[in-house]
Structures are given as structure tokens and as C-alpha cells.
């Protein structure tokens, strides 16, 4: 990126209240863009709406239902013209019903509304795991990616590796003197995690960077790829402790999936839990790096890096009380 001042654009944002959405909105506002965020409060009432407004300072906040095309048009776009659609929207759980409703169908509605509003460019936050799809949410994301590419709009599809919050769930247990949990030997997967702020900046830069147009963009954070074992090896010294690990066999995850799936045939709520377990197993056994289609292997060197903050910088800030860990629906530990 050059130091040139960005051309201000009207930007319509989905998913702005999530952790990545908030940093993306902040980066867009800082770059001088006129940002309108379309959100649905987690709870009804004026207080919840005010919280959303405070989270998205500098942006205009509009409320409605992203799954309802009429609400998108009436409450969101409101007959106005926009230049860019930015989506950080994602299903909360990844179970099939949720995934197809949000990761695919809601985005299809938004794409149609955006085209009607004159949008010419869409920046989509996707996920690097879609390059090896095994679960419903990955197929749903891929289906929308394909629709966006075929839409005629300029597109920037950003596929980040791992988020800091996804790799920070064990800080509290290690502080309590417990071992760091790894699957297998703790070395069978690796990732190049990226911070919320660095990813938000990357997404915002897609509006100005011509090299990111009509591209699928895998991106990780700075530095070398790290394994779960290396995460623990860095965390313990920050606490003045000797590294200790608890090794969990992947076969245990397989057993949990099998049991929940069997019970889910007679107890429907457990079927959803079985899918969550399958998602957990996927992340426990697959690296979040660029996949080389020729070899079928993950390649850290082929995974682009962006930003300045490393996972271990973040660990240090959390332990100093300078930052906090926001856990999500995909929390494992």
C-alpha cells in the first residue's frame, strides 16, 4: 500500500458488531469512508441499540434482519446508493441450518440488494478452511464465493487463517496451574494467526488496493507458522512456569462424534452437538495454511502474511491486563 489518501466511498457493512467487524469498521472510518452498518441487536430494546451504536463509533448504524430481503432493502439500504459492500458476517455455530441461512442465503440477499443500490465492489470475509471443505459451513461459504465471482461485481474474497481469540482459550487454565491441552503430539497442525486489528486493516485496504481486486486472498499474520505445542511453549514462560502438556488422542474426538451422532438420531438437539464436535475435530487435525493442490500438503511459506502483531505479543498483552479474550461459539477449551 502507498501512503496516498484513499478516495472516500460509501460503504455498507454486514457483521459489524463482531470482533473482526468492529476493527474493520474502525479502519474504514479512519480512512475517511462513509460507513453504514446494518445490524441486528442480540436483544431488543433501546439499550441494546445504543450498545451497537457505541461499538461502531463513527459509522451510521441501522437495524434490521439480514436474513430478510425486504428488511435489507427497507431498513438497510433505504433506497440509497453505495459504492462497496463489506461483509464480516458469519454463522455463529456452523451447523448446517445456520450455515446455509447466514453464510449463503443471507449473503445472496445482500448481494442482490447491493447490486440494486449501485454497489460495484464487494469485500467478503471468508475462511481459509474452505479450501478443504468437509463441513456444511464450508460448503455454504464456497457456494456464496462462487455466486459472488459470477455476479459481475469486483470482488475481494479474504480467507484469513486463525484468529487470536481461537488460540487463547487456554490462557486462563494455564494461569491456574493446569497443563496446556494438545491433540496428538501437538505438532500435526500449524497456523499463522492474525490479529483482529491487522485483519480489519487488511479488509479496509481492499477498497484501495487494485492488486486485491477480483482475487481470492489467503492471509495470515506476521512471523512463522506455529503449532499448538509451540503456543504452549511460549505461553508458560510468560507466566514464569515450566511447560506442561496434556496429550489428547484424536481417537477420543472420533468417539465423541460417534456417540453424539448416534444419540442425535433419537434426540435431535444432540445431532447439532455432533456437528459441532465434527467441526472441532476438523480444526484439531487440519492446518490453517494455504493448501498446495498439487501435493495436498499445507504450505506455510505460501501463506501470505500481513500486519505487525504476533500471537505471542497478544498473549503478553492479555497477561498484563492490556487486552481481553472474547470467546465465540466455536470455543473448544
Short names for language-model regions:
Residues 8-33:
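N-terminal Rossmann NAD(P)H-binding glycine-rich loop of SDR-like oxidoreductase domains
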Residues 20, 199, 203, 231, ...:
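Non-catalytic, hydrophobic alpha-helical segments
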Residues 43-117, 129-131:
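NAD(P)H-binding glycine-rich loop region in Rossmannoid oxidoreductase-like domains
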Residues 84, 251-333:
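A hydrophobic C-terminal alpha-helical subdomain
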Residues 91-177:
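Glycine-/Pro-rich loop/turn segments that contact NAD(P) or position catalytic residues
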Residues 106, 186-207, 215, 227:
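Substrate-positioning beta->alpha
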Residues 166-173, 206-217, 241-243:
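Glycine/proline-rich active-site loop of Rossmann-fold NAD(P)-dependent oxidoreductases
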Residues 190-197, 219-237, 249-258, 309:
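Substrate-binding strand-loop-helix patch
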Amino acid at each position: 500500500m502507498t501512503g496516498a489518501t484513499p478516495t472516500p466511498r460509501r460503504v455498507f457493512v454486514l457483521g459489524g458488531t463482531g470482533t473482526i467487524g468492529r476493527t474493520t469498521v474502525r479502519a474504514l472510518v479512519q480512512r475517511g469512508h462513509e460507513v453504514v452498518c446494518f445490524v441486528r441487536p442480540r436483544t431488543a430494546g433501546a439499550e441494546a441499540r445504543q450498545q451497537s451504536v457505541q461499538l461502531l463509533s463513527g459509522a451510521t448504524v441501522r437495524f434490521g434482519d439480514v436474513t430478510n430481503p425486504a428488511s435489507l432493502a427497507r431498513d438497510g439500504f433505504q433506497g440509497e446508493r453505495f459504492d462497496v459492500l463489506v461483509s464480516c458476517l458469519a454463522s455463529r455455530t456452523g451447523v448446517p441450518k445456520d450455515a446455509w441461512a447466514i453464510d449463503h442465503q443471507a449473503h445472496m440477499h445482500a448481494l442482490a440488494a447491493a447490486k440494486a443500490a449501485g454497489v460495484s465492489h464487494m469485500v467478503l470475509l471468508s475462511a481459509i478452511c474452505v479450501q478443504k471443505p468437509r463441513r456444511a459451513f464450508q460448503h455454504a461459504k464456497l457456494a456464496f464465493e462462487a455466486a459472488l465471482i459470477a455476479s459481475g461485481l469486483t470482488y475481494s474474497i479474504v480467507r484469513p487463517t486463525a484468529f487470536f481469540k481461537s488460540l487463547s482459550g487456554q490462557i486462563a487454565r494455564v494461569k491456574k496451574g493446569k497443563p496446556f491441552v494438545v491433540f496428538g503430539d501437538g505438532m500435526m497442525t500449524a497456523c499463522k494467526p492474525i490479529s483482529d486489528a491487522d485483519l480489519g486493516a487488511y479488509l479496509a485496504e481492499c477498497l484501495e488496493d487494485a492488486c486485491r481486486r477480483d482475487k481470492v486472498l489467503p492471509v495470515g499474520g506476521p512471523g512463522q507458522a506455529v503449532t499448538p505445542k509451540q503456543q504452549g511453549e511460549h505461553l508458560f514462560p510468560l507466566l514464569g512456569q515450566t511447560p506442561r502438556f496434556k496429550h489428547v488422542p484424536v481417537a477420543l474426538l472420533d468417539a465423541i462424534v460417534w456417540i453424539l451422532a448416534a444419540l442425535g438420531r433419537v434426540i435431535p438437539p444432540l445431532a447439532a452437538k455432533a456437528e459441532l464436535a465434527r467441526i472441532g475435530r476438523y480444526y484439531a487435525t487440519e492446518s490453517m495454511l494455504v493448501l498446495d493442490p498439487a501435493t495436498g500438503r499445507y504450505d506455510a511459506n505460501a501463506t501470505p502474511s500481513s500486519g505487525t502483531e504476533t500471537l505471542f505479543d497478544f498473549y503478553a498483552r492479555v497477561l498484563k491486563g492490556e487486552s481481553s479474550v472474547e470467546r465465540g461459539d466455536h470455543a473448544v477449551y
